[in-house]
Amino acid sequence: MASKRWCFTLNYKTALERETFISLFSRDELNYFVCGDEIAPTTGQKHLQGYVSMKKLIRLGGLKKKFGSIAHWEIAKGDDFQNRDYCTKETLIAEIGAPVKKGSNRRKIMEIYEEDPEEMKLRDPDTALRCKAKKLREEYCSEVSVFSLRPWQIELHRALMEVPDDRTIIWAYGPDGGEGKSTFAKELIKYGWFYTAGGKTQDILYMYAQDPERNIAFDVPRCSSEMMNYQAMEMMKNRVFASTKYRPVDLCIRKKVHLIVFANVAPDPTKLSEDRIVIINC
């Protein structure tokens, strides 16, 4: 039978034997570990009484393979605190991590996900999906990109060094494709920018409302050029808008942000005021 929570008893003769056994427990593989020394009152035998909460399910055979066959193992009863009290009633020898009461929310959701992603997918698929997305985003943002900036990218970078206002929309226009628009847009994600390929107004506003102080990058695919969402752009740039999807909220934000549109088409002058647009030709 497999379990994450086990208790053990290890009879030993020397301190070296005891310490060698304890050293086998890795912080990366467990949530909590504690052990204490005891001496049997009738025989005088020294033994280590311990408890471990592993991150993954493990069977008795797996424990013996990992920690050797000299210890006696049983599936633990009670919570972390109860097992800690039992194991340390005479002497505390070693402790890794912190005990958690049964049903406690002290441990972070991400830690629970990383212990057993498949279990969380079954129990709470929505939370598991968000955890997976967060992990993938962290990995993406940690990757170092090396490339030479093109002239238009240098011009755009200089524009972004200016203090943003509540009107200007920067339009990176490249009709041919392959100019590096999407490459630049995706790189901005690593600097905390909100990235969107467009879509329905309320879908965009709902996602942006999660953190509405971010700079904004619209990376519009060629196939969506005829459905450019000028409404969402202007609402987000104005810093006052309502997100009505799922959790309705009215947002009034003081912080001004940059908004860039990366597109294969020029802006439609009938949809946005001409003085709003700063075009950078790619």
Swiss-Prot record:
Catalytic residues as annotated in Swiss-Prot or TrEMBL: 86 (for dna cleavage activity)
BP GO annotations: DNA replication
EC number, as in UniProt: 2.7.7.-, 3.1.21.-, 3.6.1.-
Motif RCR-1, residue range(s) on this chain: 7-10
Entry keyword Hydrolase: yes
GO molecular-function terms, A-Z: ATP binding; ATP hydrolysis activity; DNA binding; endonuclease activity; metal ion binding; nucleotidyltransferase activity; RNA binding; RNA helicase activity
Motif mapping: RCR-2: 47-49
Protein family membership: Belongs to the nanoviridea/circoviridae replication-associated protein family.
Protein name: Para-Rep C2
Classification of source organism: Viruses, Viruses incertae sedis, Alphasatellitidae, Nanoalphasatellitinae
